[in-house]
């Protein structure tokens, strides 16, 4: 019996569905080590995303404002291909790329309707990590 051969290469992964969304939400999670930008439709389905590491920065350079700017530009460009024009921005975290990411979303051509800070605040929950001594 002859060995089986594949007649064509199979692609793995999801098929890209072209959504046509005018309004959406932009979530910016800015930590001390990285910045992640996710752009969703009003229902919460992710249209595009980018992070400082995804854009090509490694190590301590991921935490810079410039890396956050590049990540936000990349996510905005992908979202605009799906027809996105207006976003509401939700910012979370204490990182250095918060304001830069918002500014670069505006510079990329997205109209920012509102900016909300959704950083979680504990009501004296978990014990924080020990103080750093340098």
Swiss-Prot record:
Keywords, alphabetical: Ribonucleoprotein, Ribosomal protein, RNA-binding, rRNA-binding
Keyword Ribosomal protein: yes
Gene3D superfamilies: Ribosomal protein S11
Gene Ontology biological process: translation
Pfam family, one: Ribosomal_S11
Top-rank lineage group of the source organism: Bacteria
Gene Ontology CC entries for this record: ribonucleoprotein complex; ribosome
GO molecular function list: rRNA binding; structural constituent of ribosome
Region span, Disordered: 115-134
Subunit comment: Part of the 30S ribosomal subunit. Interacts with proteins S7 and S18. Binds to IF-3.
NCBIfam families membership: PRK05309.1, uS11_bact
Family: Belongs to the universal ribosomal protein uS11 family.
Physiological role: Located on the platform of the 30S subunit, it bridges several disparate RNA helices of the 16S rRNA. Forms part of the Shine-Dalgarno cleft in the 70S ribosome.
Annotated protein name in UniProt: Small ribosomal subunit protein uS11
Species the sequence originates in: Corynebacterium kroppenstedtii (strain DSM 44385 / JCM 11950 / CIP 105744 / CCUG 35717)
